[in-house]
């Protein structure tokens, strides 16, 4: 009899220590369990539309350069995952180092970059 695969849900924190997203590798979900992006093996974070958003740090946080021209190419997205049920309680955020002036926390300063499939500025018109 096959045993079910246990998926590990990793909270992604913002700079204030709040869990604003969850990682079930390679997918990123918002607090409502909706798919908002994905991570490459090199820790680059992409939106559901395939646009580069930033990088996943060891904290874990999603950060990007303040003056990012985003010269990375748009990537094809992996197959859309099912919605998850986020945990009711998450561990406290680890101590995080301050970001340098040239870096920003995406979940705090640019959360619109990680939107769901049915919303967002970059979505194609019908």
Describe each PLM feature range.
Residues 1-10, 51, 57-126:
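Long terminal segments
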